[in-house]
Amino acid sequence: MMKGGMAGLMKQAQQMQEKMAKMQEELANAEVTGKAGGDLVTVVMTGRHDVKKVSIDPSVLPGLDEDDREVVEDLVAAAVNAAVRQIEANSQAKMGSMTAGMNLPAGMKLPF
């Protein structure tokens, strides 16, 4: 009976892990839109914190033509993405030093 109970518990844990992985993937692929200045600036970002698009209303940059405005939008998106990647790298380095002495199972990431 004890072995059967343990096997059932292990199976439930595996199912939960699979569901969590699926949910994490769905969240990572989700897109959200942030707006500021009465919708003059719009940012589309994924759940992975990747900026996909920045849109700046032409009235915000009145001296620029459409091509130049698009360049500014792309540069803002690239700068935000670079900052996010730096934060991720810093977090991994800090967590790595914190968990260096722990014998964590392969593939286990902190924080959960």
Curated annotation (Swiss-Prot):
Q: Name one GO molecular function term.
A: DNA binding
The record's section on InterPro entries has: YbaB-like_sf, YbaB/EbfC
Q: What is this protein called?
A: Nucleoid-associated protein Pfl01_1806
Report the domain of life of the source organism.
Bacteria
Looking up NCBIfam families in the UniProt record yields: DNA_YbaB_EbfC
What are the record's GO terms for cellular component?
Answer: bacterial nucleoid; cytosol
Which UniProt keywords are given for this protein, alphabetically ordered? Cytoplasm, DNA-binding
Q: Name one Pfam family in it.
A: YbaB_DNA_bd
Q: Where in the cell is it found?
A: Cytoplasm, Nucleoid
> What is annotated about its quaternary structure and interactions?
Homodimer.
| Function of the protein | Binds to DNA and alters its conformation. May be involved in regulation of gene expression, nucleoid organization and DNA protection.
Family designation: Belongs to the YbaB/EbfC family.
